Amino acid sequence: MTHQDLSITAKLINGGVAGLVGVTCVFPIDLAKTRLQNQHGKAMYKGMIDCLMKTARAEGFFGMYRGAAVNLTLVTPEKAIKLAANDFFRRLLMEDGMQRNLKMEMLAGCGAGMCQVVVTCPMEMLKIQLQDAGRLAVHHQGSASAPSTSRSYTTGSASTHRRPSATLIAWELLRTQGLAGLYRGLGATLLRDIPFSIIYFPLFANLNNLGFNELAGKASFAHSFVSGCVAGSIAAVAVTPLDVLKTRIQTLKKGLGEDMYSGITDCARKLWIQEGPSAFMKGAGCRALVIAPLFGIAQGVYFIGIGERILKCFD
């Protein structure tokens, strides 16, 4: 294995490890974010803490980890692609010690955002259905006779009321809609992830460079971690309106009286008219609390060089 192959493999391992650790730590907050963004009209949850407490009471501790399995399975390739792609595009666009260029860094971030959606879109499509299942169950309690506009995951003609699984949802989507079913909301995902990467990667690089230590040849672990957290939280809040649109569009099953959306423009228009401009920032705090440690951990893993250490064991 050449040095370049070793470097790429190490980066993929680092991205995967960072994703697994990060998701395990912050998944309940991500679940709260999805449920807060999806509630229409009369609020079922007053905020993140209220959502987590009600979820724990109604569904138990593991109810807060609904959808975690699909995320843990796919977050490794997703984060690995995102971080490795950004690194690749940075090297491609800024060769031979070229001075830092904000435009080139933003282009590299754009490339990373475009690459990652291959995994991100189906992963979040499945995750959102599982995360929102508990909220929908409460919505429908005592309203079994009311007409519903939501889709059901069925096997045969009778509707099943069992807890949905990622495998069942994926199979139903593929059977009824083909591959396009798993990539529902692809445009909204691109619209969120490309701006996020354009903001995050250049911001992190410049913040991290402020703590560069000439003796060590890099910034300290603490500085890299904080830089990742700050850049991640700023980028996350900045694209929250786009994340709200993506979540609403990708949610297949709706509560009673909740709208279906034909696309990004239709979703934005209905959201503005029915819920007001503040609806576009639903879950912003949760999103910052999810993304900040995710990317702080990612940069910390890169700093420690876990991938390089693992590969050395096989030399």
Curated annotation (Swiss-Prot):
Q: Which residues carry this modification: Phosphoserine?
A: 145
The record's listing under InterPro entries reads: Mit_carrier, Mito_Solute_Carrier, Mitochondrial_sb/sol_carrier, Mt_carrier_dom_sf
What membrane topology is annotated for this entry?
Multi-pass membrane protein
Keyword Kinase present in the record's keywords: the answer is no
Please list the GO terms describing molecular function: amino acid:proton symporter activity; L-aspartate transmembrane transporter activity; L-glutamate transmembrane transporter activity
Supply the Pfam families for this chain. Mito_carr
**Keywords per UniProt:** Membrane, Mitochondrion, Mitochondrion inner membrane, Phosphoprotein, Repeat, Symport, Transmembrane, Transmembrane helix, Transport
Q: Where is this region: Disordered?
A: 141-160
Q: Where in the cell is it found?
A: Mitochondrion inner membrane
Q: Which PROSITE patterns match?
A: SOLCAR
Q: Which reaction does it catalyse?
A: L-glutamate(in) + H(+)(in) = L-glutamate(out) + H(+)(out)
Identify the stretches annotated as Solcar repeats.
Answer: 6-92, 100-210, 219-308
Give the protein family.
Belongs to the mitochondrial carrier (TC 2.A.29) family.
Q: What is this protein called?
A: Mitochondrial glutamate carrier 2
The organism's lineage? Eukaryota, Metazoa, Chordata, Craniata, Vertebrata
